[in-house]
Amino acid sequence: MSDQFDAKAFLKTVTSQPGVYRMYDAGGTVIYVGKAKDLKKRLSSYFRSNLASRKTEALVAQIQQIDVTVTHTETEALLLEHNYIKLYQPRYNVLLRDDKSYPFIFLSGDTHPRLAMHRGAKHAKGEYFGPFPNGYAVRETLALLQKIFPIRQCENSVYRNRSRPCLQYQIGRCLGPCVEGLVSEEEYAQQVEYVRLFLSGKDDQVLTQLISRMETASQNLEFEEAARIRDQIQAVRRVTEKQFVSNTGDDLDVIGVAFDAGMACVHVLFIRQGKVLGSRSYFPKVPGGTELSEVVETFVGQFYLQGSQMRTLPGEILLDFNLSDKTLLADSLSELAGRKINVQTKPRGDRARYLKLARTNAATALTSKLSQQSTVHQRLTALASVLKLPEVKRMECFDISHTMGEQTVASCVVFDANGPLRAEYRRYNITGITPGDDYAAMNQVLRRRYGKAIDDSKIPDVILIDGGKGQLAQAKNVFAELDVSWDKNHPLLLGVAKGVDRKAGLETLFFEPEGEGFSLPPDSPALHVIQHIRDESHDHAIGGHRKKRAKVKNTSSLETIEGVGPKRRQMLLKYMGGLQGLRNASVEEIAKVPGISQGLAEKIFWSLKH
């Protein structure tokens, strides 16, 4: 423990009420956040002679200050604790490295409802089905639904401005409600109801109704209609036969855990209406010496209680581990949801099968992750040896992308001991330079990236500059001129240039802009990690450049029209479904856009035509 922190004097001031405490190191950084039913009793336990673990010993040795926040209840303390953990990301807490809201399938409340993927707050009028584990699962489900139940998935701005059916109608993926006379209101509403039942897990009702309609059509000698409905029935059956369905039809989240070699995997199965919608594996950041019980307890708390995560709480949560705070967690979740949430650890029947499945998936994912980590570790060790460094814990790589000097974008990608750290990838729009001047672009991005305060844990060991000697010279100049508090001499600057044939394996590396570079054997693990991060940076830069170029392409034609500012451009593109839709629109259609007069509509029409 630090000599400067007087634990005895501090503990005399602490209350015995429930609350949250924050521990700080000498640099004023929060290193641990915890909660307690009795703050005095809990904090006193840190300053006993016989501490429970090495992790606690290491934590206490760094304490310089402790702040406490008193709360009314233990539930309030639990919620505040996880909000503080999310805010401060303390190094001695187990951290859930995921900050994305889960996607849902949204069925709008329009006259002719549409299906779409939705993330975030649920403000729009309509119904939400999910959550799904990722965007891919939603897109796959939407594609499947479009084949079985052809209701529209287009934006309202496109739907409102159609005068003839689109390609989706031609290939049988949409009933074409945008054009009058193609589908009756009753038929469209019926298909929407099928979608609603299907997404609610009521497949049997869908099949019963479809079979009844097929028989009616057949009796009325409407054989084409009967055949179409028969195909729908077969498609629904093919989908439902592939999935294990629980007899309960309940909404569950099932959480399985695996722990090995200091790494934890938490696997979550999302079950709605008795069906597995999907699953996802998480690898929380676990400080050394952490017990499995703390990993599970902290993960579950962060997963459900951090407000910005937009989690949808099921009626029941099945856990692979018995928690000491299970009752407190259930009460907190129930209070948050405004209804009863059950937390169970010893399920039976179908629930036990789900828990076994989650546990198996967690173990499999952890084995795969450890194998991948071992490969990355070997490559980074080899790279450290080549570069004569003690170790390489963090690498950053930069690349520049543009088209004939326009829409220049720089990318920065980050690797740590586990490989790509995609949450820390960044793109930088480059402005104020001569078009096509890659050196100036590199100079600008490096100054923006490193010309500011950086946490010690974020200082890279190696900075890879894609582009060879010239780009490396720019990097050296930038670092020589940096006026920063962190150790700017710590990162090793390394230039990488492709060979004459620009083939993988023929790269040349440079420590200095002058003189000859050196190459590594094609089978070198060190070269492989360099190629990996260089390719990631290249792809990230190109992706950003393409987005920027597409944005300019969609707006540049309008920017030259007098009277059409940013807000009107946005409104025009939104209502017309993009620039192409606007080009195809008549004067009368353009004039229907809010804020566009008849005179301005004529000006826009003729400007785009000529």
From Swiss-Prot:
Domain GIY-YIG, first and last residues per copy: 16-94
Domain UVR: 204-239
SUPFAM superfamilies on file: C-terminal UvrC-binding domain of UvrB, GIY-YIG endonuclease, RuvA domain 2-like
Chief site of localization: cytoplasm
GO biological process, one term: SOS response
SMART domains to which the protein is assigned, alphabetical: GIYc, HhH1
One of the Pfam families matching this protein, by short name: UvrC_RNaseH_dom
Domain of life, per lineage: Bacteria
Family membership: Belongs to the UvrC family.
Annotated function: The UvrABC repair system catalyzes the recognition and processing of DNA lesions. UvrC both incises the 5' and 3' sides of the lesion. The N-terminal half is responsible for the 3' incision and the C-terminal half is responsible for the 5' incision.
Subunit details: Interacts with UvrB in an incision complex.
Name of this protein: UvrABC system protein C
Gene (name only): uvrC
